[in-house]
Amino acid sequence: MQCLLREKPRSLALVNKDHALMFHSVPQNKNSLSVCVAEFTALSEKPLEGFRKISSHRIYGTLGLIELEGSNFLCVISGASEVARVRDKERVFRIMEVCFYSVNRSNWDHIRQENYSPDIPDGYDTDTQGYDSYKYAAEPFSSLRKLLTNGSFYFSLDFDITTRLQLRTSQTMTEPQYDSMHTQFMWNEFMLRQLIKFRSHLNGDEKSALDGCRFFTCAIRGFASTEQFKLGIQTIRLSLISRLSSLRAGTRFLSRGVDDDGNVANFVETETILDSSKYCVSYCQVRGSIPIFWEQEGVQMFGQKIDITRSLEATRAAFEKHFTSLIEEYGPVHIINLLGTGSGERSLSERLRQHIQLSPEKDLIHLTEFDYHSQIRSFEDANKIRPMIYSDAETFGFYFENNEGQSIVVQDGVFRTNCLDCLDRTNVIQNLVSRVFLEQVMIYTRQNAGYDFWQVHSTIWANNGDALARIYTGTGALKSSFTRKGKLSIAGALNDLSKSVGRMYINNFQDKGRQETIDLLLGRLIDQHPVILYDPIHEYVNHELRKRENEFSEHKNVKIFVASYNLNGCSATTKLENWLFPENTPLADIYVVGFQEIVQLTPQQVISADPAKRREWESCVKRLLNGKCTSGPGYVQLRSGQLVGTALMIFCKESCLPSIKNVEGTVKKTGLGGVSGNKGAVAIRFDYEDTGLCFITSHLAAGYTNYDERDHDYRTIASGLRFRRGRSIFNHDYVVWFGDFNYRISLTYEEVVPCIAQGKLSYLFEYDQLNKQMLTGKVFPFFSELPITFPPTYKFDIGTDIYDTSDKHRVPAWTDRILYRGELVPHSYQSVPLYYSDHRPIYATYEANIVKVDREKKKILFEELYNQRKQEVRDASQTSYTLIDIAGSVAGKPNLIPHLPANGVDKIKQPSSERSKWWFDDGLPAKSIAAPPGPEYRLNPSRPINPFEPTAEPDWISNTKQSFDKKSSLIDSIPALSPAPSSLARSSVSSQRSSTSIIPIKPNKPTKPDHLVAPRVKPLLPPRSGSSSSGVPAPNLTPVNVPPTPPPRKSSASQRSGDLLASSPEESSISWKPLV
C-alpha cells in the first residue's frame, strides 16, 4: 500500500495494486466545517494521473482524518512491528510510526516525518527519540504524532482486535464488520467515523473490494505480546492483550472515578489466550477505578488527599450504569478491592460497600476486600486471596474452542480488580487470577505446566503492568520486579523509588499537556468536529435507487402465525387444533411456536436440559400442521432451539424453502445473573428473500413486584443476543418477541377477579406492569402490541376456568404476550381455552411484505446511474469543488443534500454562496429559477411591486404588446434622440436632463424599480481607440419593438439596474426573480 499526492487540484490517494481511495480538497470558508470529497475507484477504470509518491515507506492503513488548525490531515501508519500472533493467521502489530498528510494544504509536504527503522528493537522507547525537536515544533500534528508513536497503540490486519475471542468467533476478516467493532476500545473511532460512514454508502461489490484493500485500520491502546514454548510435545502460544477504554481516558490525576455515563478511569480489559493445534482458550478480566465521583490532587509531595465530590444519592445513577453495562457484557461481577485502611482509601471502600448494598444488581455483584499492603510481604502471601476467589473462578469458567472452531465452554462472569490507581497492586493480583484460570485449563486439558511456563507467564504480566502504568502515569509499574521474580529485592525497591520520583514530576508538569493531546485524538475538545467526508456520486445513486426500487425488486405478502404457551411441564398432546387453527383463520406460510416450562425447572434440568420433551412437542405440532394440508405442499421444520424450559420452533411450507436462507439460532441466559438457564430467551433469525425476520421467545423473572428484574432481563437479552457477524435482534426488518414475560397487574386479587367477570379489561390494562414500563420507555422500545381483548392468561386452577384458589391467591395477569416491531400488518391477537396448564395459550397472526431483489437488475441500474453521474461530474468540471456543488443540481437533478451532515453540529450552517443561502430551507436556490414562457415574452411592468397584492395583471406580456398605463404612455411620447457630438455629450445630456419637455422628472419615491419601468436599452459602449477622450458618447436609443428609453440616470439605484440589464445581452439569459 502506498500514499500518493497530486498537487493540482490537490488530492491524496491510498493505493494498492488494484484500487485507490482518494481524498480531494475542497475550498473552505473561515467558519465552515472541515470537508473533503472521498472517492473509491478501481485503477483499471480510472488510472491515476498527476500523482506522485509522497512517502517511500510501506503504508499499513489509515487511522482516519482529523482537522488541525484549519487543515484536514490524513493519518497513515508508516511503521509497525509484529509483537503478537494470537493464532496462526492472527497477527498483532505495534504502531511505530505515523505520518500526517494534509488534504488541502501543501505547507508540510517538504517535512520528512518517518523516523522509524525496522532495525529499532521492539523494546525501544520511541518517546525518547527526540522527534519533537525545534524543527517540528510548528507542526500542528506534532503532539498527536508523539502520542501515537510512543509504543502503546496496536492494530491488526487479520482480526477485530477491539473484541475478545469469545465474541468474535463468528467474524472473519474476509468480511470485516466495522459496525460491530467495540468502540469502547477503539481509540481512533473519532478519526475513522466518517470513513466507516463512507463505506456504508458503497454497493456490495465496492464494499467487498474496499474491505479487501484493508485501507481502514482500527487501533487499540494498551498492551499485546505473545510467547511461544513447548508444553509436552505441543507447541503453545501464550498471548496477552490489554485494551484500555477510550471512554474516560486520561492521565493519572486528571482522570479519576466515574463519569455520569458510568465510564470509569483506567478501565482495562485484559485477555489471556492459550493457543495450540488442538484448542484455543481465552479468559478475560477487567480493572478500573472505583465507580464513584472522587478526585485527588497531584501537586502534593506525599499523601495526596482523596476527595469524594458527590453524595451517595447523587452517585447512584452513575454507579448503576457502570455495573449494568458490566453485567450485560460479561455476566456476574466479582470485585476484588485492594484498597487499604488509610483514611482516604477507607472512605472509598466504605462508599463502595454502601452502593453495592443499595444496588438492585447486588445479587450479581460479589465483593472481596483484600488489604494488599497489610497482607502481602512476599509473592507467596498473594496466594492468601485464592480461597476467596476460587469458587467464583470455577463458576465463571473460561472460553474453550476446539480445533474446528466450535465453542465448547463459554465464560460467564468476570473478576473486576481495583486499587487506587488500578496499576501496581492490581497487576500482581490479576497475574494471580490469570494463573488460577490457566491451572483450570491444565486440568481440563490434562496437561502439566512446569516452572518455565509459569516464568514466561509472570514475565509477560510484568511487561503488561509496565505498559499500562506508562500510559497512565508516564513511568513503568511499581513492584514489577515482584511480579517477574516473585520476590522483593533492594534493587527493585530502588527502582520503585526512582519511578515514584518520576511520576511526581510528570504528574505535576506534563499531565495537562498529555491530557489535551488525548482529548484531541478522541475528539473531545470544545468545538472539535470530525472531517466531513462527502461522496456526492454515491449519495445521488443510492437516492435514485431508493426511488426506483420497483424496477429491480418484487413484493409479496407472507402470512405468519405466532403462538406461545407456558406448559407448566405438562406432557405433549396433539389436541391443539383450537390454538393452532382458529376459526376464520387461513393456514399461514410460517408457524412460529414458543413454549415455556417445557420441562419442570428442577436443578437437574437446569444444569443439563433434556431435549426429549422438545422433540415430542415438535413432532405433535408438525403432525397437526401436515394433517391440515390435504392438498399442496406440506410443512417442514425449519429450525428449533431450547434453553432449559424455553423452546422455540419454526415450521414453514415446503414451497417457502427455496426463498429462505441464512437461518441462525442463539440463546441468552438471565437466571442467576446469566449463569443459569431457568430464565432467558431463545432466538431464531433468517432471511426470506431479501427481508430479515427474527423471532424471540423468552421467559422472564417471576414475582409480583419484580418488574425491575424483568426490565433487567429484557435489557440483558436485547443487548446480549447476538448472531453471526455481530448481528443483533434489531438488525432485522421484522421482529416478533413473545413468551411468558411475567409482568403482572398492580391490583389485588379481590379487585382483579370481579373486573374480569364484568369485562372491565380496559380498566385492568391501565394497571398492567408491561404497559406502564413500555409507556415510560424502559422496555421494548419501538415494539407494538395489538389491543388485548381476552382475559388474563394466568393463573388458573389446572383443568378449570377458575383463577387461582390456592392459599397464595396469585393475582390474575396477562403474563403471556406477543409484541412486534417493524411494518408487520397484524390481523388477530387472542387466547384459547386449553386446560393442560395453569396458563392459557395465546396466538397472533401477521402479514409481512417480503422484498425480493433482482441483484442483476440492481447492479445494471447502479452502474447506469453511477456512470451517468460520473459523466455529469466530468462534464461540469474537473475540480473537486464541483463534486461538492454537483451533489446539489446537475442537469436539472434535485438537490439531494442541501446541507452538510450535522453530526452533532447542527448549530453551524453551511456558508452562503452565490447559489445557496443558509437561511433558505430545504436547499432552495438563492436565485429565482422562474423563466418567461418564451423569448417573445417579458416581465409585465404593470404588476404591483408587492408580489402578494391581488391583481389581474399577468406575469408575462408579449414584446409586441403595448402597455397603456400612465408611465408607459408618457414614455411612448418621447421622440427618439440623435447622438450628440462627443465634444458636446456632457452638456447635451445635461440639457436633456433639465428639459421637462423631453424627459419627465422622476418622482422622489418611485412606485416601481427602474428596471421594471424602463424598457431595455442598448448599453453604453466605451469610446473606440480613435474617438475623442474628452467626453462620453451620447447613448444610442434606437428602439427595437419597444418604445424609446431615457438615458441612464446617475443615481446608484438606477446605475445598478442598468448594470443588471447590461450584463445580459440576451433576455432569455436573465435570472428572473420575483420581487419580495
UniProtKB/Swiss-Prot annotation:
Residues 534-880 are annotated as: Catalytic. It is found in: Cytoplasm. It comes from the Eukaryota. The keyword Cytoplasm applies. Residues 1065-1076 have a biased composition (Polar residues). GO terms for molecular function: calcium ion binding; inositol-1,2,4,5,6-pentakisphosphate 5-phosphatase activity; inositol-1,2,4,5-tetrakisphosphate 5-phosphatase activity; inositol-1,3,4,5-tetrakisphosphate 5-phosphatase activity; inositol-1,4,5-trisphosphate 5-phosphatase activity; inositol-2,4,5,6-tetrakisphosphate 5-phosphatase activity; inositol-2,4,5-triphosphate 5-phosphatase activity; inositol-4,5,6-triphosphate 5-phosphatase activity. It holds the Pfam family Exo_endo_phos2. This is Inositol-1,4,5-trisphosphate 5-phosphatase 1. It comes from Schizosaccharomyces pombe (strain 972 / ATCC 24843) (Fission yeast). The gene is syj1.
